[in-house]
Amino acid sequence: MDDWDAAVDWDDADLGESAAVLYSGGCDSTLAACRMAERFSTVHLVTFTRFGFLETDNPSLHIERMRQRYPDTTFHFHKIPYGRFYEAVEGHQKLRNLWRFGSMTSVPCGSCKVAMHWRAVVFCLENDVKVVADGAIKGNDHFAEQNPRILMPELQK
């Protein structure tokens, strides 16, 4: 068993036939999508958009190649706005905090990732998808949302 799927019981028959991937179109999320295509007949490639995001059409570049590589898997590309989720996480006082605390204000990247994962959970609930993956790599475990020592104990309560 690889490290990437150590937390998943792949023998559990209740995983369903589909998986979702938070998909940017980069090499890490494309690899995650390919790994999901090896196990599921349907893979939902979910790209989130909000004000300030550029080049959100880039993910479509690799989809046709994945369809050719995994002809038995159906890939669905979803481009989903998630701005209100980001605003809820980032908070309504971000400009005030920037003025008050300057560079000590929290970096929005963490809030953005949390909002994407939150919106991904909603997507999965709406579409009866029980498995979701992203292209997070171990080198980013300095972010709380990508560090199992921080996140997993809270989820396992």
What are these regions (language model features)?
Residues 44-46, 78, 133:
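Hydrophobic/aromatic beta-strand patches that form the interior of the parallel beta-sheet core
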Residues 48, 82, 134-137:
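Short loop/turn segments at strand-loop or loop-helix junctions that form parts
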Residues 1-12, 123:
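Phosphate/ATP-binding catalytic cores across multiple sugar-kinase/actin-like superfamilies
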Residues 39-42, 67-76, 155-157:
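Structural alpha-beta junctions
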Residues 61-65, 95-97, 150-152:
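Short, hinge-like loop/turn segments at secondary-structure boundaries
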Residues 102-157:
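Active-site adenylate/phosphate-handling loop in enzymes that bind or generate adenylated species
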Residues 7-66:
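ATP-dependent adenylation/pyrophosphate-handling site
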